[in-house]
Design a protein with these regions (language model features):
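Solvent-exposed, non-transmembrane regions of membrane-associated and secreted proteins
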Residues: 1-135
Length: 135
């Protein structure tokens, strides 16, 4: 489950970005990290920017650096902080690859809104080490 307070959003997250999964919520893109966190991971979660009356990632532009994003899986809840926001071209797949020594959650949607997907709006969220992990 993905929770983004700044967007007033709570939505399910499915494994695999099939049409059915994206119609029902957000989905982890194939060939990206599983939604379990850890060093050298980047879990990329895609969502429609509005779909058949549901907002989904419609208001992703409300997010700002420093905002909190949580992802709950079967083992617990991971809390991330928005670290960067970029607008990229659809072919720039290197921008969503794993970055060494970082634990990332990347949110991905079409941009601009209702444009048919000419570009991608990308929100990079990083899980910062807790005090016990940084010692």
């Amino acid at each position: 489950v993905l929770e983004i307070p700044a967007m007033e959003l709570i939505m399910p997250v499915y494994l695999g970005a099939s049409d059915a999964h994206l119609a029902a919520g957000a989905a982890v893109l194939g060939n990206t990290s599983a939604p379990i966190g850890g060093d050298n991971t980047n879990c990329v979660i895609a969502g429609h920017r509005g779909w058949r009356g549901a907002d989904y990632f419609r208001h992703i532009d409300r997010l700002a650096v420093g905002d909190s994003v949580t992802l709950t899986n079967l083992w617990g809840t991971l809390t991330y902080t928005v670290a960067d926001i970029q607008i990229i071209q659809p072919h720039e797949v290197e921008k969503i690859k794993i970055q060494p020594n970082r634990d990332l959650l990347t949110l991905l949607t079409c941009h601009p809104y209702a444009s048919g997907g000419r570009q991608r709006y990308v929100v990079y969220c990083e899980k910062l080490p807790t005090m016990s992990q940084s010692r």
